[in-house]
Structures are given as C-alpha cells and as structure tokens.
Curated annotation (Swiss-Prot):
<feature type="compositionally biased region" description="Low complexity">
    <location>
        <begin position="564"/>
        <end position="574"/>
    </location>
</feature>
<feature type="compositionally biased region" description="Basic and acidic residues">
    <location>
        <begin position="608"/>
        <end position="628"/>
    </location>
</feature>
<feature type="compositionally biased region" description="Acidic residues">
    <location>
        <begin position="592"/>
        <end position="607"/>
    </location>
</feature>
<dbReference type="GO" id="GO:0010264">
    <property type="term" value="P:myo-inositol hexakisphosphate biosynthetic process"/>
</dbReference>
<feature type="compositionally biased region" description="Basic and acidic residues">
    <location>
        <begin position="251"/>
        <end position="267"/>
    </location>
</feature>
<protein>
    <recommendedName>
        <fullName>P-loop NTPase domain-containing protein LPA1 homolog 1</fullName>
    </recommendedName>
</protein>
<dbReference type="InterPro" id="IPR027417">
    <property type="entry name" value="P-loop_NTPase"/>
</dbReference>
<feature type="region of interest" description="Disordered">
    <location>
        <begin position="564"/>
        <end position="646"/>
    </location>
</feature>
<feature type="compositionally biased region" description="Polar residues">
    <location>
        <begin position="270"/>
        <end position="283"/>
    </location>
</feature>
<feature type="region of interest" description="Disordered">
    <location>
        <begin position="245"/>
        <end position="283"/>
    </location>
</feature>
<comment type="function">
    <text>Required for the accumulation of phytic acid in seeds. Phytic acid is the primary storage form of phosphorus in cereal grains and other plant seeds.</text>
</comment>
<feature type="compositionally biased region" description="Basic and acidic residues">
    <location>
        <begin position="577"/>
        <end position="591"/>
    </location>
</feature>
Length: 738
C-alpha cells in the first residue's frame, strides 16, 4: 500500500461499499460524498460543542490518524489512549479490506493520469492529497480523537453525525435574534456565526435598505423611518378607527358564540350592540407609546414578507443562516415558525436602562448622550417601550429571553440551546406547537442549559471510578471535596452506535455500594458545550450528600429567576399551562396585544424589580443567596462585634491568608480549601474523612485542628483562592483515596 505523503482532503463516502460510490462522475468529485478539510472539520467539532483550541488540535489529530499507514485502516489501534483494535482486524471483514484497496487504487490512479491532466494542475494536486474513507471509519476516527482529549458526552457519536449533517447541508437551522435597537444583536450574531460555523448572517436592516431602493421616501415615508419613530408617520385617527373596528368584530364574534351556547343570547347581543354603537363614532386616540408600537409593527410587517421568501429559499438549499434585527416581532415570528420548521428564535434584551443608554453613546457622531446630537437617546422612551412589548410577547409565546450583559455567556447559552433543539428535532419533535402558539420545547431546553450552568458553576467535573468497581461515573465535585451529583458513563454502544448506560447500584453480595466510597481513579474531563453540556446527561439519581444551605438557596434563586419574566410580574410557568388557543394562524400578529396602554418602561426595567438580573448571564446575585451564617460573618467584620479572642484569631487568619496568597504552595491550597470546608461544619457530612484527609495537612505534615467558630473575613477570599488553585482539589481527592 502506498502511503499518502500529504493529506489535505478527506472524502467521506456514505454507505459501506466504497467501490460503487468511489467512481468519479466527471466533475472531479465522488458521488454521495463530502470533502472535509481541516478548517471544515474544526468548524464541525465546534458546532457539536468542542472548544475552539481543542477543535483545532482534534482536527489535526484526525488528519494525522488518517494519513498514517493509508488512513490507519490496517493499523493495530485507532487511539493510543484506548488501545482499540481496528474495525477490520476486530471483525475480520475481508470485503471491507478489499474496498479499502479499491479506494487506494483511486488515489494511485491520480498519479498515473498526471500527463493526461496537465491542463488542470490543481485537480492533480487535489487527487494526490485526497483520501477516501467510509462514513463509519470517519466517525470512529473522530470519536477516538475526541477521547484522546478526554471529551465525554452523553451521545457523542450521534452529536458528531448531527453536526456533520448540518455542515454537509443535509439539514439546516435558521437562528432568529429578536430585539430592539442597542441590545447587541449584531455583535451577538457575528460571534454566534463564528461559533456555529454559519457564514450567512443577515440583518433585517439590510432587507429594509433593499426595499427602500424600490420606493421613494415621499411615496412611503413609513419605510424610510426608523422603527422607534415610525409611529410619527401613521395617522392617529385611522389607527384608532382600525383598532375600534377590530374590537367590534371580536365583540360580534363573542356575541355569536354566546347566542349559540345560551338561550338568552339575544338579550346579551342587544346590550353588546348598544356598547358598540356608543363608541362607533368616537374612537379613542392612542397614546404616544402605543403609536410607537403600532409604527414598529407596521414597518415590521412590510419587512417580514420579504424575509419569509428568503427563509424559504434557504431551506430549499439546506443553508443555515442567522437573522438578526428589530423587525423580528414575536407575533410575526410565530407565523414564520408555522411555515418553516428550521427556525429557532431568541429574544435579546437589556434589562438595565442605564446600561442600555450607555450603548448608544458609541453610535453618536460626537460620542455623547446629548439628545440633541444623539437620536437614539432622544427616542430612548420609544425604544424601551418597544423592548417592553417584545419581552411581553416573548413571555406569551415562551421564547427564550437573553439578557445580553455578558456576550460570551450569551453566545454559549444560545449555542447550547440551538444544538439541543437540533437533537430534539432529529428525534422527531416539533419545536413549534400550533395548538398553543408557543415554542415550549425551545424554552425547556434553554432553562435546562441555565440550570446546568448554575449547577456546574459550583464545582468541577471529574471522571471517577470507585474502588473495586468497573463502572465509571461523571461526578460534580463540591468545593469541599464531596460529590454533589453523579452521572453514569460507559464506553459500550448498542447496535445503532448509541451509548449504553449502566444503572446498577447493587453489589454481588446484595449490599448497596455507596457512590461516595473509596476512589480508585479520578481524572478531569472535558464536556461538550462546557458548563452547559451536563444538561444532556441522564441523572443517575445518586448523590453522596445533601446540598448545603447555600447551594440550595442559590439553586432556588436561580431557578425562580428563570421562571419569572423580567418584564412581567406573572410567572412564565403558569402561562405555559394555561395558554389560550391560537386565534389567527397567519404571519400577521394578533390585535389584542396593545389594547391597554403599555406600562412605563422605568417600572418594568428598574433595578429594584430586577435585582436577580446579574451582569453575567447564568450567575446568581451573591446578595440573594447568603445564608444566616454569612450575614453573621459580614456583621462580625465590624470591630464592635468582635471579642478580644476573636479579634486575635481574625488577625491570625488574615496574616495566614496573605502569606498563602504570596507563596501559593500546594499545602497552602489545602488550607484555603479547609477554610471553605469549615463553613459547612454544621451540616451533616456522610463523606469519609479519608477523602479530605489531605486537606488537613499543613506545612510540617501534622494534622491541624480548627475551631468552627473562627470565621473567614470574606466569602470572596476563599473563592478567589480556589479559582487560582483549582487543581489542588483534584490532588486532594486522589490522595484521600486508599
């Protein structure tokens, strides 16, 4: 077998018999195949949740494995870390080996036809540097390369296949980023496109600009206006009359329903007709805020029709795209989702009005917030009113809302949610529920991602194995060294290639084996999508100890903040169960949404009502998760609350903490972890003392006893220490295991 000197392309052929599909069709490509380069493979790995630097290294490793010994087909192992036999050596499939020989002949024929193809030098180079492999071999090699970099996933093989289908344009996804002006949609879409590997990013402003080239400003001033002051170009009387007619039509419909249900429907009809007649000639003019929303809706309706045609063309070509813009009103988006199953919408907003206002300073010509020189500041009331309207519509339709105060976490949350929705769509679920006119599936996935991020932010993940057991577990470690939660992990797969998870918890003698028992092995691992990736794992239901009071309060605060809207006082969970049936199935929105005067933006977005909205999305406000002991700690910071003995012990701890920060030795890491461990001394611990024995070791090697009444000065001191020396915890667990 001739060894390929350089591999630039990997042609992945569908099917097991590569001899039939390797035949060239005259265009220099193979039928039913896809050509992967290193950047394309790297983008595919990033789409399935790998970090960018890991995706770069894994793609390079895959090409090295494919290159070595003729795509590594006849090598004794695919992965040094697993010592796994080759698929062909393990099964002894002679026909598969014959297919590989035929595929290699295609590569060798390229060198024989050099003289015939001198007019196409690039085609010759491409054939010389191309290796043809089957889909199964390609997936196996990539999965083994992922295992070398300690990537563990619930269904990693299925995620890789799904990511390949998106990259090969066998499936597509359309991400919609809704939101008003100044909330960071353009920046978010650019970063998200880079993360997902989507090169088509379209703004609705560009669609509006294209439409303006076909009509003069005098002919259609509404189209030439900005969304936040488009209401100025509407006739208030005409708008009021139109809304009055719609209200009368709804009342007539309700009268007909009452007449059909009750025998006294005629009397009710007469009373309703008198009410309608009394307001027929006196339409009530709308407020300026309602006119701003009506102008926004009118311009959005013009843009959304052209966007509908574009999405139809993209879906026919299986092209993934990201669309962002203020014209993506949620009632219009629901109409689009009924026609286009590839849409995944998100609502981007800024809860803090001051931060929202600061974003407009960079858009002004003179970097100022002067309303005379900055039009965004001048119309900030209308912008906030439109955002309030969009947020309420998002709550009604259960569209996930992203408080875009931290761009990195916003991108990570959207990325993980989009891929989770693709998994469920691949399983046959519909993202849009036409009965309730909601997207509860997307909302559930987003909440799962937020819950997973909140859970995993309290510790670190390690792959553990109990002593005397062959079962591997994914464990979430608390900062004190105990296990908060575990998930089963196994390398076995079924006939379809999906992993088989073991759930046995009983030993041979019938005694239950504790999860928190003695450890035989513990090593850190990488999860797809980072902290958000644990949401895809099935819960094992086994924990070593109950969570601490602080952890419970943090989880409660985080969960409650996700279920409540930042723009509406009613819970989102209750709205999902009592959602009324959809009345209008067209792309146009319903008309009852602005019957009442929208509330002041200041009341909906005030800092007092939204203290749970932190600068970092997914984190919990520290002030809302403090236990009684922590408040006592803060109160004791004042010298008037300290006794002489406590003052002396506090100074001793302060000096020791400063010394630890300077030296940063391994023993100091254990002492700092011990300080945090003693904070939960009053809680019931079932973890063996051997697990944390190394944490009690000080510089001279002796065991040091601490009094529970000695408090730390600040919570942030221990957290920052662990953040700098996080590896010390893993060493402590390994030393604690017999």
């Amino acid at each position: 077998m001739t060894e390929t000197t350089k591999v630039m392309y990997i042609v992945v052929v569908d099917g097991t018999d590569t001899a039939e599909t390797v035949e060239e069709d005259g265009t220099g490509t193979w039928k039913d195949s896809f050509r992967y380069t290193r950047p394309v493979l790297q983008s595919t790995l990033q789409l399935m949740g790998c970090k960018a630097r890991h995706a770069f290294k894994i793609s390079r490793r895959v090409f090295e494995l494919i290159r070595s010994e003729g795509s590594l087909i006849l090598s004794p192992s695919l992965s040094p870390s697993h010592s796994k036999e080759s698929e062909f050596q393990k099964t002894g499939d002679a026909s598969a080996c014959a297919n590989v020989e035929k595929a290699n002949k295609v590569n060798s024929l390229a060198t024989d036809d050099v003289d015939k193809s001198k007019s196409k030098p690039f085609e010759v180079y491409k054939r010389r540097t191309t290796v043809v492999v089957s889909r199964e071999i390609f997936v196996n090699v990539v999965c083994d390369a992922l295992a070398e970099y300690k990537y563990v996933g619930h269904d990693q093989r299925a995620d890789l296949i799904l990511s390949c289908r998106i990259r090969e344009r066998k499936e597509s996804v359309t991400v919609l980023l809704c939101g008003t002006s100044g909330c960071g949609k353009s920046t978010l879409s650019a970063l998200l496109g880079s993360r997902l590997g989507i090169t088509t990013v379209v703004s609705t402003d560009s669609i509006r600009h294209m439409m303006r080239s076909f009509v003069d400003e005098k002919q259609n001033p509404l189209l030439w206006a900005s969304t936040y002051h488009a209401g100025e170009y509407l006739d208030p009387v005409a708008v009021a009359e139109s809304k009055a007619r719609r209200r009368r039509a709804k009342k007539m419909d309700s009268i007909e329903d009452e007449k059909a249900k009750a025998s006294e429907g005629g009397k009710a009809k007469n009373t309703q007709q008198t009410d309608v007649g009394s307001t027929k000639n006196t339409p009530v003019l709308l407020s300026p805020k309602q006119m701003a929303v009506e102008g926004f809706k009118a311009q959005s309706e013009m843009v959304i029709d052209n966007l509908d045609r574009l999405i139809t063309a993209w879906e026919e070509r299986k092209e993934s795209v990201i669309v962002e813009g203020v014209h993506l009103s949620l009632n219009f988006v629901m109409g689009l989702m009924k026609k286009h199953p590839s849409i995944v919408p998100f609502m981007v907003y800024i809860a803090n009005e001051e931060k929202h206002l600061e974003r407009f300073a960079v858009r002004a010509k003179y970097m100022t917030l002067d309303p005379e020189k900055n039009k965004y500041v001048k119309y900030i009331r209308n912008i906030r009113t439109i955002q309030d309207y969009l947020c309420k519509r998002a709550d009604k339709h259960l569209v996930p809302k992203i408080n875009n105060t931290n761009v990195d976490k916003s991108v990570a949350a959207i990325h993980a949610t989009v891929f989770s929705c693709l998994r469920r769509r691949e399983a046959g679920e519909h993202l849009y529920d036409a009965t309730t006119n909601t997207v509860s599936v997307i909302d559930d996935e987003y909440r799962n991602q937020c819950t997973a991020n909140s859970l995993s932010s309290k510790g670190m993940f390690q792959l553990i194995q109990r002593k005397g057991s062959s079962r591997h577990l994914m464990a979430l470690l608390n900062t004190d060294g105990t296990f908060a939660r575990t998930w089963p992990v196994t390398g076995k797969v079924d006939e379809s290639g999906k992993p088989v998870f073991c759930n046995e918890m009983i030993e041979e003698n019938g005694m239950e084996h504790p999860v928190y028992g003695y450890l035989q092995k513990a090593e850190p691992v990488n999860l797809q999508f980072g902290l958000f990736g644990i949401s895809a794992w099935p819960s094992d239901g086994a924990t070593s100890r109950a969570g601490s009071v602080d952890d419970c309060k943090a989880d409660m605060a985080e969960t409650s903040s996700r279920y409540y809207s930042s723009c509406c006082s009613s819970p989102r969970m209750s709205e999902g169960t009592s959602k009324e049936l959809k009345e209008d199935q067209s792309v146009h929105g319903s008309d009852e949404e602005v019957e009442d005067d929208p509330p002041e933006p200041d009341t909906d977005f005030s800092d007092d009502d939204n203290k749970r909205d932190h600068d970092e999305v997914g984190s919990v406000d520290e002030q809302s998760t403090k236990s009684d002991e922590e408040y006592d700690d803060l109160a004791m910071e004042d010298k008037s609350y300290w006794t002489d003995e406590e003052e002396e012990s506090r100074d001793t701890i302060a000096i020791m903490s400063e010394k630890n920060n300077k030296q940063a030795t391994k023993e100091d890491k254990y002492i700092q972890n011990l300080d945090l461990f003693l904070r939960t001394a009053n809680q019931q611990l079932v973890e063996p003392l051997q697990l944390c024995a190394s944490l009690l070791t000080c510089e001279n090697g002796n065991t040091r006893l601490w009094l529970g009444k000695e408090k730390m000065r600040k919570r942030s001191l221990s957290i920052s220490a662990i953040g700098k020396h996080g590896s010390g915890l893993g060493d402590a667990i390994l030393l604690g295991a017999p």
